């Protein structure tokens, strides 16, 4: 089973680079699918998305599929995956955290995720495909993610980070490499088939503590501006209209959630997959202030 060919859907995803690094030297046949005309990861066999979607290049029979695609996109591709052995797909804990958001667009996103989860489970059950759905929490890699790296860019640019006081909502950031570990375990663990598992990083920490560690990773003293949520909403709405805070992409719901505990029960995933996630430490061996795309390339 562990020698099954691997088909990675979503080759430009944040996690893809780490998957490729972990698969090197394993002897497994690897095929990458992405919306590119050339492979986004040098040295890996590559199939353009358009060719797989059109059926020009069929999925390898018996392959273990790892999907990094948004779930609704994966659902549209399922007819082209008939004959594969298993699918390990990434969902999101946003299916829970955004279900009661004060923004209609976020509630709609949660609804689409929930519908896609059901569709994936139904299709895999009908076609005899082993399915494992992994819902990661806040995913980061200290380089190009939309969470930690984006906050770090804001801190670099402005020298401070605004927080909705007291910013005590708990978070469980998970590194992209730990997500890759969990996915690789999932495709080869029959006991995980049919499961929807939440996965997260090490010990939870408050939103405020997370931002303080980001400053430490930049080698800077934390400068936090703690304000009421209502004031931050108005200020960032105005800043967005003026084009001053596009990088941060803060919406009103982001500030509201800074004081919500977005933690999830991950015991089943840890027990079944054994991915042993690292603690959140941007000031650790891979220092946030020193990392760039070339560093990631060197790691792989």
Question: What residue spans do the PLM features occupy?
Answer:
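N-terminal Rossmann-fold cofactor-binding loop
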Residues: 32-37
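NAD(P)H-binding glycine-rich loop region in Rossmannoid oxidoreductase-like domains
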Residues: 38-84, 89, 93-103
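Active-site Tyr-X1-5-Lys
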Residues: 107-133, 142-145, 149
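Mid/C-terminal beta-alpha module of Rossmann-like enzyme folds, strongest
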Residues: 185, 189-249, 266, 271-300
């Amino acid at each position: 089973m562990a020698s099954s060919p691997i088909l990675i859907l979503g080759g430009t995803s944040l996690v893809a680079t780490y998957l490729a690094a972990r698969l090197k030297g394993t002897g497994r046949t690897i095929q990458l699918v992405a919306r590119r005309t050339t492979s986004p990861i040098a040295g890996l066999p590559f199939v353009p998305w358009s060719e797989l979607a059109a059926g020009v290049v069929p999925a390898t029979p018996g392959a273990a599929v790892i999907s990094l695609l948004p779930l609704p996109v994966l659902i549209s591709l399922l007819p082209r995956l008939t004959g594969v052995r298993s699918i390990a797909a990434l969902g999101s804990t946003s299916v829970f955290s955004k279900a009661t958001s004060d923004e209609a667009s976020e509630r709609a996103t949660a609804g689409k995720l929930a519908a896609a989860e059901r569709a994936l489970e139904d299709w895999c059950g009908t076609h005899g495909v082993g399915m494992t759905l992994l819902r990661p929490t806040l995913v980061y890699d200290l380089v190009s993610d939309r969470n930690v790296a984006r906050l770090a860019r804001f801190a670099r640019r402005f020298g401070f980070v605004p927080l909705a006081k007291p910013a005590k909502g708990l978070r469980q950031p998970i590194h992209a490499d730990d997500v890759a570990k969990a996915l690789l375990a999932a495709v080869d663990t029959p006991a995980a088939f049919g499961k929807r598992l939440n996965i997260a990083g090490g010990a939870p920490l408050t939103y405020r503590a997370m931002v303080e560690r980001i400053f430490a990773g930049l080698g800077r003293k934390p400068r936090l501006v703690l304000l009421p949520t209502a004031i931050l909403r108005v200020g960032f709405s105005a800043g967005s209209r003026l084009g001053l805070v596009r990088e941060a992409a803060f919406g009103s719901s982001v500030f509201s959630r800074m004081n919500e505990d977005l933690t999830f029960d991950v015991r089943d995933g840890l027990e079944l997959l054994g991915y042993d996630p690292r603690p959140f430490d941007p000031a650790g061996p891979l220092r946030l202030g020193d990392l760039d795309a070339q560093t990631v390339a060197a790691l792989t």
